[in-house]
Amino acid sequence: MASVNKVILVGNLGRDPEVRYSPDGAAICNVSIATTSQWKDKASGERREETEWHRVVMYNRLAEIAGEYLKKGRSVYIEGRLKTRKWQDKDTGADRYSTEIVADQMQMLGGRDSGGGYGGGYDDAPRQQRAPAQRPAAAPQRPAPQAAPAANLADMDDDIPF
């Protein structure tokens, strides 16, 4: 059976991005994103709120863009996957583990007052170019036979604006 490792976050940066470069020159950017859940407590009737902090890492061009345009407090959309990495504590030498979100896509949200443009979407990897849809040569126009509504749903795909 296929598996899925997909994370989608919409939240606010808790601090300015930290950008560093690996020995081979690849950019690495770490950000901390807060998401907040709100609910009404059934027992007391009070509004409750819980904030969760997420460690997000971006690489290469996506990391450079994040470092340049993102600022503390900025609203952002992140799409990526969970990854747990193993590292050694410098003081004790003990093995440690960190689970973080490796971002594949980033979208800046909010307007100019939020510290940037009107939002720009960025992917870590270049998108695959799709071949343009092949359309048959124009045939002489004939009136289409009247069919019952929703009889052929495949024809409706051409009318969808997205």
From Swiss-Prot:
Disulfide bond residue pairs: none
Region listing for Disordered, in residue ranges: 108-162
GO BP annotation list: DNA recombination; DNA repair; DNA replication
Segments carrying motif Important for interaction with partner proteins: 157-162
GO CC, any one term: nucleoid
Pfam family, one: SSB
Composition skew (Low complexity), residue ranges: 128-151
Gene3D superfamilies referenced in this protein's UniProt entry, alphabetically: Nucleic acid-binding proteins
Composition skew (Gly residues), residue ranges: 112-122
SSB domain residues: 4-110
Function according to Swiss-Prot or TrEMBL: Plays an important role in DNA replication, recombination and repair. Binds to ssDNA and to an array of partner proteins to recruit them to their sites of action during DNA metabolism.
Subunit structure: Homotetramer.
Protein's name according to its UniProt entry: Single-stranded DNA-binding protein
